[in-house]
């Protein structure tokens, strides 16, 4: 597909200033201009080789009165010294408006699907802008229902808030985000914007096909900067997606659901760019501007004037180290943290959400109500006490515990299994239809288990179900089967 990167800005031709390439070092391009034509830091540049598609770059530093250092957002293969460079006179811009709905865009706003080109006169907006002033922000106290039991109960999301799924490799972050897309986007009345940041092209293709199949694509914008693209594209693609979300919030007065997978790749791309620009690394090799870069993205995700942008993000945790500087920098901006546990994934407890480590600022009686807060607190207390007893159980066995502790262990194990549920996005692999559970049913089920109503049930009756009624049916079927087996006539002894 031809590149449309030269259309990633809307400056008039008369405003353009010409320079030429003096050095190319990977994704870094040094460009010389006339003394009075030096572009500003953050401005877009278009490198226009004679025999290749134009390459979009962004000014990162002034090296002298006539030279700038720019970061290319597309491959620099084939560029050479002396290549002409245009400075249109403004920052990188992305197309916004109704025309981008249902489309797949890249970091420059160019279409990357099989649809027609965007209208030539489409409105464009700079991808960099200041966060709204504090006085204009709206608080976040309305629950954002997901239909996922463990999240709605223990780490509820806020309408207009920021939530993230934290986890190492292979614990189910992307599956959880895709289930949220399936469960939430289909019944969401606003606009959805998905930013694929540094993830696999295969996953991006699958998501595009899934959205087409489910019929939600006409109300969704997909913006991809995939794993194979230069660090500049992965570093800037979240801002392109966020700019589109801000347009629908500010101009169309529509609530927006912003999904990002994976925010860690944004930080990782920033570290690559920092190294390419020759900056001194900080802790663990991250860029010295880590906190500033994360804040420049997260602080723009806000609700303004009664219209919300709700963000759900996936965050890769390198080596399962939750003290990693990138992870802690991202976590500082969130309202809800959903932590995925490798040990729970190993036990088959999907979604592998850690009920103790996950948290939300909304889990307060004044926000969620007394009943919800009390049930969530008791569920956490029992599961935490069960974990404290696991060493004793592994050494001596559960029979050595007191009667009260044995009952508590049984309820904790049943709670863990009740908080699992099959997902719609995994139905093709498991054969089990997905379940979406109302919060009231989740609370009622947990209350029944906490009260001991399920103490005699088989644990398997509560595994991978929706509501407690489904578990009750399983238990009744198991009891009926057991009775039938006991009542079956014994086999006749062979004749002597």
From Swiss-Prot:
PANTHER family: ATP SYNTHASE (PTHR15184), ATP SYNTHASE SUBUNIT BETA, MITOCHONDRIAL (PTHR15184:SF71)
Protein name (record): ATP synthase subunit beta 1
Region: Disordered, residue numbers: 474-496
Gene expressing this chain: atpD1
Upper lineage: Bacteria, Pseudomonadati, Pseudomonadota, Betaproteobacteria, Burkholderiales
Primary subcellular site in the record, as a coarse category: membrane
An example Gene Ontology CC term for this record: proton-transporting ATP synthase complex
Subcellular location: Cell inner membrane
Any single Pfam family the record assigns to this protein: ATP-synt_VA_C
Stated role: Produces ATP from ADP in the presence of a proton gradient across the membrane. The catalytic sites are hosted primarily by the beta subunits.
Enzyme class, broadest EC rank: translocase
The entry's keywords: ATP synthesis, ATP-binding, Cell inner membrane, Cell membrane, CF(1), Hydrogen ion transport, Ion transport, Membrane, Nucleotide-binding, Translocase, Transport
EC number(s) given by UniProt: 7.1.2.2
Residues the entry annotates as binding ATP: 167-174
Membrane topology: Peripheral membrane protein
Molecular-function GO term, any one: ATP hydrolysis activity
Subunit structure as annotated in this protein's UniProt entry: F-type ATPases have 2 components, CF(1) - the catalytic core - and CF(0) - the membrane proton channel. CF(1) has five subunits: alpha(3), beta(3), gamma(1), delta(1), epsilon(1). CF(0) has three main subunits: a(1), b(2) and c(9-12). The alpha and beta chains form an alternating ring which encloses part of the gamma chain. CF(1) is attached to CF(0) by a central stalk formed by the gamma and epsilon chains, while a peripheral stalk is formed by the delta and b chains.
Low complexity bias: start-end ranges: 476-489
Family assignment from sequence similarity: Belongs to the ATPase alpha/beta chains family.
Catalytic activity entry: ATP + H2O + 4 H(+)(in) = ADP + phosphate + 5 H(+)(out)
Gene3D superfamilies for this protein: 2.40.10.170, Bovine Mitochondrial F1-atpase, Atp Synthase Beta Chain, Chain D, domain 3, P-loop containing nucleotide triphosphate hydrolases
SMART domains assigned to the protein according to its UniProt record, in alphabetical order: AAA
PROSITE patterns in alphabetical order: ATPASE_ALPHA_BETA
């Amino acid at each position: 597909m031809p590149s449309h990167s030269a259309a990633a800005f809307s400056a008039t031709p008369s405003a353009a200033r010409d320079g030429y390439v003096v050095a190319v070092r990977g994704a870094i391009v040094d460009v010389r201009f006339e003394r009075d034509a030096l572009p500003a830091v953050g401005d877009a540049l278009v490198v226009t080789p004679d025999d290749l598609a134009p390459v979009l770059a962004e000014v990162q530093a002034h090296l002298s009165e006539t030279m700038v250092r720019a970061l290319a957002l597309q491959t620099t293969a084939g560029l050479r010294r002396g290549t002409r460079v245009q400075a249109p006179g403004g920052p990188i811009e992305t197309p916004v408006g109704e025309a981008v709905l249902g489309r797949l865009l890249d970091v420059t706003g160019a279409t990357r699907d099989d649809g027609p080109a965007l209208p030539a006169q489409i409105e464009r907006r700079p991808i960099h802008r200041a966060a709204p002033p504090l006085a204009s922000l709206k608080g976040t106290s309305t629950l954002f229902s997901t239909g996922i039991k463990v999240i709605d109960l223990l780490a509820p999301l806020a309408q207009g808030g920021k939530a993230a799924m934290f986890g190492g490799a292979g614990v189910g972050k992307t599956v959880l985000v895709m289930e949220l897309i399936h469960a939430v986007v289909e019944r969401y009345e606003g606009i959805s914007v998905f930013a694929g940041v540094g993830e696999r092209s295969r996953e991006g293709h699958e998501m595009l096909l899934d959205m087409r199949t489910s019929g939600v694509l006409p109300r969704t914008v997909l913006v991809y900067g995939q794993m194979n693209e230069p660090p500049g594209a992965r570093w800037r693609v979240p801002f392109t997606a966020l700019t589109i979300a801000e347009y629908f919030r500010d101009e169309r007065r529509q609530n927006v659901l912003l999904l990002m997978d994976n925010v860690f790749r944004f930080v990782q791309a920033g570290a690559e760019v920092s190294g390419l620009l020759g900056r001194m690394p900080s802790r663990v090799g991250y860029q010295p501007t880590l906190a500033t870069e994360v804040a420049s993205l997260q602080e723009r995700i806000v609700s303004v004037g009664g219209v919300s942008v709700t963000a759900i993000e996936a965050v890769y945790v390198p080596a399962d180290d939750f003290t990693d500087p990138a992870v802690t920098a991202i976590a500082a901006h969130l309202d809800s943290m959903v932590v995925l546990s490798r040990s729970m994934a190993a036990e088959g407890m999907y979604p592998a959400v850690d009920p103790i480590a996950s948290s939300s600022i909304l889990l307060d009686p004044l926000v969620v109500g007394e009943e919800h807060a009390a049930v969530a607190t008791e569920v956490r207390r029992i599961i935490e006490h069960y974990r404290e007893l696991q060493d004793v159980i592994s050494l001596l066995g559960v029979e050595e515990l007191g009667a009260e502790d044995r009952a508590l262990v049984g309820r904790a194990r049943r709670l863990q299994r009740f908080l699992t549920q099959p997902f719609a996005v995994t139905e093709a692999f498991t054969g089990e239809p997905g379940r979406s559970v109302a919060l009231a049913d989740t609370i009622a089920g947990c209350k029944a288990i906490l009260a001991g109503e399920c103490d005699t049930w088989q644990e398997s009756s509560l595994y991978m179900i929706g509501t407690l009624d489904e578990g009750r049916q399983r238990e009744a079927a198991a009891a009926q089967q057991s009775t039938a087996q006991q009542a079956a006539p014994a086999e006749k002894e062979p004749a002597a």
